[in-house]
């Protein structure tokens, strides 16, 4: 017998202990984009038997598939443990079989790590892990052309620590077992690999010795070189004829598709860096060109499948040679790199049946050309934006702001009246370069916009006028240091007060027109005295500290919401500094924390609403090869600290946020997921719902709407509407039935104000228009009846909803009376759970 529970909701009066993953599953997030600017892509693959089916493997946004030549895309890897990829390969003999190597190979300061290799046997629809979990970064995957069970994997290995899980691995049984067939040492992996077109027993491998730390990068060593096997990987010989002696850095490889003995390489070297060619299978080499831009991040070369004198080199710019490397010319971008083809290229797929047709991808997503690079179609319909920092204003509806990796800074609405959703046209560029933190002034049209390495501008959102605000030392002998992701904050007590973090904290009381500086708040360590791979920082020769222009600077700033004189900062060299007098004097309190090595990178500090002395701090030690989560709380200005990691799996923590209505409710953004605590961090629950696996670099709770806004580094923005039920959870979780507070709602009407748009345009999801009614049922019933009434008990609307016992459920009422019965079948009632016509009483 079915049981129904009646819930009566008087509308006008509603204006106004642990929790499980399952209890959160009915709270779904909206992916709002943008897709107008893409994210980094490392590989493009096309089904050989169906050229309409295209795959892209991204740096941190997972794997995506199109079945219609890029008109529309779908993510096919969201439910897996990682979202970062270096390479994919499709079997020529059985195109249903695809292998994907996780962990990007580009070595930058924001690189994430993978957990081995994955396999699909149904054209990428589903995937399973098949081993090599501790290789962390896989640069190349090659499948035997006649046997999909024979696979070679180039494992670059741990970027931040020594490990033996690197080299060339081979399987002969489809990934059931793996054998390491080429190994140099515990700091040298394999960054590229090529197979002879006519003889699959001949392979070339480029080994690469490199390591990154929080303070710098060493991009070369004696382990780097080129190796060759002629017996399918059983034995390997180093190729040295004509190659520069001594330490080498990153090497890129490409083999001719038409003639077996022609091999190309880009080689990073202190004196003889450049483009090399061998015409005898690698026995001897000749440098034919000095071109080799920023090899640590690029070193990508591709040979035309129909003419081996035509080679493409991908770097900040896009180059092509038609004479085997003697001359390279830069491919045109029309009319500019933003409107046409964006810079920073990482992969190329050339149609084997038509060399004029290719896909080009890199930091800004995917481009397609049908005329050999004269003109391009920019496929900006994949929402894989990589945000570093985010912000939100107080407009209605509010706007969200974010700074993207290599794709500027953007603002866009949290909701629109477009019947299609939140469109690319709704997003506006508000800054340049690599966008970082964005702070809109809540009392004016000004936006404070940070980009890489301390660049800050003030933008008038009404006029577009921009003014540079970066502080410079008056003493020419001093040089300020700023992190790549420079922290920026506006005071919670005065919108004219702005904070900017460098090695000192810079404080402005006039909107950035002038700055006061504190003492140096870092440890001020000379990184030239530190070592990477046994080499002093001062003596690094190849790609020295690439991506880390300085060390010893503030990473996070937090002013107390309760008292403007209390300020916290955390630095990349492990300092946690607190001031109780507005920045005049500082106390370094990281030494009071136990259970973590000194000097650990501080990813976030957060001053609590609980009381003036309360704060949280998170550390990120993956740059030391330590994947553990580190979260701490203090209630006495840092004198004592309590660890808060129960329930957190392996993976670094990037950000922590506190609910403005309940300090016991905390959110964490980590390298792979979002976590929630409803008991002040005593334990944590994964907030999965419909969220993808990706990097969660920043998050905020909107102070008015209480929406949770997620800034991901791989999947753009996600929004959870109205988190008020989470703030109320601890006091109502065991009630038989409860209706959570309903926030004030605005009546929106869809406006069909745009038509005749291409189907390839991606649109973000609008919120459910109307009042979001959240409720909890712990009783043993099958359904609930929800009735909305006026004060005088006049029934406005009634819904019947199925019950998911113990979970927070939602219904969106569109603020309307029910339509006439003749129109109910045509109704487009909006809601997180859209009622069926037969369920409306």
PLM feature segments, named:
Residues 17-761, 768-771:
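Beta-propeller blade termini and top-face loops
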Residues 491, 720, 776-778, 814-816:
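Solvent-exposed residues in well-ordered beta-strands and their adjoining turns
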Residues 456-459, 773-774, 780-798:
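Beta-strand-rich binding/interaction modules
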Residues 597-598, 795-840:
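Glycine-centered tight-turn motifs at strand-turn-strand junctions
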Residues 1-20:
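Bacterial Sec-dependent N-terminal signal peptides
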Residues 680, 790-794, 841:
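Short, glycine-anchored, charge-dense loop/turn motifs used at functional sites
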Residues 253, 771-779, 813:
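Aromatic/hydrophobic beta-strand junction motif of beta-rich domains
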Residues 245, 570, 765-769, 780, ...:
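Solvent-exposed loop and beta-edge segments used for protein-protein assembly and interaction
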